[in-house]
Amino acid sequence: MTIMRKTHPLMKMVNHAFIDLPTPPNISGWWNFGSLLGLCLIIQILTGLFLSMHYTPDTLTAFSSVAHICRDVNYGWLIRYMHANGASLFFICLYFHIGRGIYYGSYMYKETWNIGIVLLFLVMATAFMGYVLPWGQMSFWGATVITNLLSAIPYIGSDLVEWIWGGFSVDKATLNRFFAFHFILPFIIAAMAMVHLLFLHETGSNNPLGIPSDSDKIPFHPYYSYKDLLGGAALLAFFFTIVLFFPDALGDPDNYTPANPLNTPPHIKPEWYFLFAYAILRSIPNKLGGVIALVLSILVLALFPFLHTSNQRSLTFRPISQTLFWILVSDLFILTWIGGQPVEPPFIIIGQIASILYFTIILILFPIAGMIENKMLKW
């Protein structure tokens, strides 16, 4: 008799994806972040569901409903801080996951990579709308500034902004629709993640050497299922350390002040995970130019498969490209720091140099380095 997991229509799908899946024998800890992102998404959906039971999407009561959750609801403070810091954890895993993809050439699986870029945009949109919901000062002014960027779109810009706002400013209608979208998007993300996996399983996973491993595969379970459990345990240990000991370390103190349209905070800035893109946006003195640079800072990821000039897939044996990769990582740290600083010298010029370097490394230096390395290896 055949084992049920191999015959039952539903079990068969799970079996092919998580049990008998042929996996390269040498994938490292950097391959753990996909499953960790799944764990983050589950945490966010569950905590978000319980928060939504007590939250009211109304300008008059939103702020106090969050305070009520923290003060009066059983373990409400824990659910709220898990949700807020879960977003940060989500982006930490996301950036590691993308970095792994760039380093090891996983972007050569074009369909999987492009779905991943769509997922990144969806997660960014969800996080932005979620940040507006507590209706603190930074929520209100962040929503005002970021939605206002759409007014830079020629001809339809102003109408588009008012259409998104549902009025002539960020108000009750905006908060209400942001809550609706913030609730539905994680389920769309979950569906897209399944498509992401579907495309990945068409080709199989890449590995640190960047060479085919079809002749030497091992089953996902028990090897990688236990490895993922260990990764998940480590992630949860780190997560609860932040949530229980430093719950406000990653947030903005301004968001503990209720939203006031008559009082602008001295420094309007997004959450830390958007600061690199915010710095690129601010580094261009023209509004439309800044918006284009902002979108391109993420869309440029889609060009990686086309800019790949090396005859080797991964950076494992490519020292010049490795150096460029780590300069790019350092550059992103600099951009993140600049995004949180006021717009004044010397931060303006540092931000502009870092922004130029970001695009130069990806669009020009990576392809050149690949060609130089081919020449050095006489390929």
From Swiss-Prot:
Positions annotated to bind heme b b566: 97, 196
PROSITE patterns: CYTB_CTER, CYTB_NTER
Compartmental location: Mitochondrion inner membrane
Domain of life: Eukaryota
GO annotation terms (biological process): mitochondrial electron transport, ubiquinol to cytochrome c
InterPro entries: Cyt_b/b6_C (IPR005798), Cyt_b/b6_C_sf (IPR036150), Cyt_b/b6_N (IPR005797), Cytb/b6-like_sf (IPR027387), Cytochrome_b (IPR030689), Cytochrome_b_C_euk/bac (IPR048260), Cytochrome_b_N_euk/bac (IPR048259), Di-haem_cyt_TM (IPR016174)
Coiled-coil portions: none
UniProt KW keywords: Electron transport, Heme, Iron, Membrane, Metal-binding, Mitochondrion, Mitochondrion inner membrane, Respiratory chain, Transmembrane, Transmembrane helix, Transport, Ubiquinone
Residues bound to heme b b562: 83, 182
GO cellular component: mitochondrial inner membrane; respiratory chain complex III
Membrane topology: Multi-pass membrane protein
Transmembrane segments: 33-53, 77-98, 113-133, 178-198, 226-246, 288-308, 320-340, 347-367
Pfam families, A to Z: Cytochrom_B_C (PF00032), Cytochrome_B (PF00033)
Binding site for a ubiquinone: 201
Cofactor note: Binds 2 heme b groups non-covalently.
GO MF entry, a single one: ubiquinol-cytochrome-c reductase activity
Required co-factors: heme b
UniProt keyword annotation of Iron present: yes
PANTHER family to which the protein is assigned, alphabetical: CYTOCHROME B (PTHR19271:SF16)
Subunit structure: The cytochrome bc1 complex contains 11 subunits: 3 respiratory subunits (MT-CYB, CYC1 and UQCRFS1), 2 core proteins (UQCRC1 and UQCRC2) and 6 low-molecular weight proteins (UQCRH/QCR6, UQCRB/QCR7, UQCRQ/QCR8, UQCR10/QCR9, UQCR11/QCR10 and a cleavage product of UQCRFS1). This cytochrome bc1 complex then forms a dimer.
Note: Heme 1 (or BL or b562) is low-potential and absorbs at about 562 nm, and heme 2 (or BH or b566) is high-potential and absorbs at about 566 nm.
Stated role: Component of the ubiquinol-cytochrome c reductase complex (complex III or cytochrome b-c1 complex) that is part of the mitochondrial respiratory chain. The b-c1 complex mediates electron transfer from ubiquinol to cytochrome c. Contributes to the generation of a proton gradient across the mitochondrial membrane that is then used for ATP synthesis.
Protein family (similarity comment): Belongs to the cytochrome b family.
Name this polypeptide is given: Cytochrome b
